[in-house]
Amino acid sequence: MLKTRIIPCVLLKNGQLVKSIEFKDFRTIGHLTSTMRIYNARNVDELIILDIDASKSGEIDFESIEDLAKECFMPLTIGGGIKTLEDIQKILNLGADKISINSKALEDMDFISKAANRFGSQCIVCSIDVKRKGGQFCVYDRGNLLEKSPLELALEYEKKGAGELLLTSVDFEGRAKGYDLELLKIFQNKLKIPLIINGGLSNPSDGVEALNLGADALAGAYIFHFSKYTPKDVKEELARQGFAVRLL
């Protein structure tokens, strides 16, 4: 049985690690080096870093990525601003284990296939941001709502060779009120690839609810920096509820 992963997912902005609320209202978490050391000490399963400056400017902060990778002793996923196979190669060469693509996948789905064929599906994470509009779930990209079904898009990504899906609820992101369970229900039992749910994790019980609706991994930021809970706390509750986790 595959073990459920607990994954801090934080943003890189101006050389600092930050968290946000609905992709705005940024709050600094800490310096790259010190934050990495905290994650290492807490034995988190993986770490996702999304470079939001690169997502806007297209200029990837390779220097910060290198600094992160040097201090990171867990599987590391890097996203933001990736446009070419050469970008992926450089990020992997700097020490990342996986890359996350969002806007580029929307623009050119064949890029997913090219990346998967060259580097292997196991290191290609496709990311979909979702926001509600009039009771419907829409794909959200760089401030725009797209008339696309998040589930249909995810299924297309899967066919193209994505190895995992990172699904983020923009409405719930940073709110610490639990995951968007209605969104998760749409995806329940629909994908063959692992689904990482992100946005809203506030306590271990939120994780239990998400896993019961088919999530394979739990991502979050607020809970691990601005609450009393640690990744170990979440894992211990999941283990009590019968989920397989990595406990040290």
Swiss-Prot record:
SUPFAM superfamilies: Ribulose-phoshate binding barrel. Its main location: cytoplasm. It is found in: Cytoplasm. It catalyses: 5-[(5-phospho-1-deoxy-D-ribulos-1-ylimino)methylamino]-1-(5-phospho-beta-D-ribosyl)imidazole-4-carboxamide + L-glutamine = D-erythro-1-(imidazol-4-yl)glycerol 3-phosphate + 5-amino-1-(5-phospho-beta-D-ribosyl)imidazole-4-carboxamide + L-glutamate + H(+). CDD domains: HisF. The active site is at D129. Keywords: Amino-acid biosynthesis, Cytoplasm, Histidine biosynthesis, Lyase. The keyword Cytoplasm applies. It comes from the Bacteria. GO terms for cellular component: cytoplasm. GO terms for molecular function: imidazoleglycerol-phosphate synthase activity; oxo-acid-lyase activity. The keyword Lyase applies. GO terms for biological process: L-histidine biosynthetic process. Transmembrane segments: none annotated. Pathway: Amino-acid biosynthesis; L-histidine biosynthesis; L-histidine from 5-phospho-alpha-D-ribose 1-diphosphate: step 5/9. Pfam families: His_biosynth (PF00977). Its EC number is 4.3.2.10. PANTHER family: IMIDAZOLE GLYCEROL PHOSPHATE SYNTHASE HISHF (PTHR21235:SF2), IMIDAZOLE GLYCEROL PHOSPHATE SYNTHASE SUBUNIT HISF/H IGP SYNTHASE SUBUNIT HISF/H (PTHR21235). Heterodimer of HisH and HisF. Belongs to the HisA/HisF family. IGPS catalyzes the conversion of PRFAR and glutamine to IGP, AICAR and glutamate. The HisF subunit catalyzes the cyclization activity that produces IGP and AICAR from PRFAR using the ammonia provided by the HisH subunit. This is Putative imidazole glycerol phosphate synthase subunit hisF2. It comes from Campylobacter jejuni subsp. jejuni serotype O:23/36 (strain 81-176).
